[in-house]
Curated annotation (Swiss-Prot):
A GO biological-process term: translation
Designated name of the protein: Small ribosomal subunit protein uS12
SUPFAM superfamilies: Nucleic acid-binding proteins
Assembly information from the UniProt record: Part of the 30S ribosomal subunit. Contacts proteins S8 and S17. May interact with IF1 in the 30S initiation complex.
3-methylthioaspartic acid: modified positions: 89
Pfam families: Ribosom_S12_S23 (PF00164)
Gene: rpsL
Length: 124
């Protein structure tokens, strides 16, 4: 326990919490325009072609965002919504595109976990 004199000389310092998703600026989602849509390979034990896109956000940030689900309709100049959430095996990818919002279509023929992929309830 510090004495009062010690606290007068050097007050207690608040810990600064650093955001994992700085480009969102404390917003739940942000809108942006795709500048490049491409595939990339994951880190060591995994192997795949992960679909990602480079996005210029409305606040001027340029970020890389993962496109989840099977198949997508994104190309350059598509307007997309991004949310936070990193992809563990893709270094530098800290955001996800929101499927079924703005220009990003939902996943075709998706039956389970539909809300995460922007798919409406199937008819009967």
């Amino acid at each position: 326990m510090a004495t009062i004199n010690q606290l007068v000389r050097k007050p207690r310092v608040k810990k600064v919490v650093k955001s994992n998703v700085p480009a969102l600026e404390s917003c739940p989602q942000k809108r942006g325009v795709c500048t490049r849509v491409y595939t990339t390979t994951p880190k060591k034990p995994n192997s795949a072609l992960r679909k990602v896109c480079r996005i210029r956000l409305t606040n001027g940030f340029e970020v890389t965002s993962y496109i989840g689900g099977e198949g997508h309709n994104l190309q350059e100049h598509s307007v997309v919504l991004i949310r936070g959430g990193r992809v563990k095996d893709l270094p530098g990818v800290r955001y996800h595109t929101v499927r079924g919002a703005l220009d990003c279509a939902g996943v075709k023929d998706r039956k389970q976990s539909r809300s995460k992929y922007g798919v409406k309830r199937p008819k009967a």
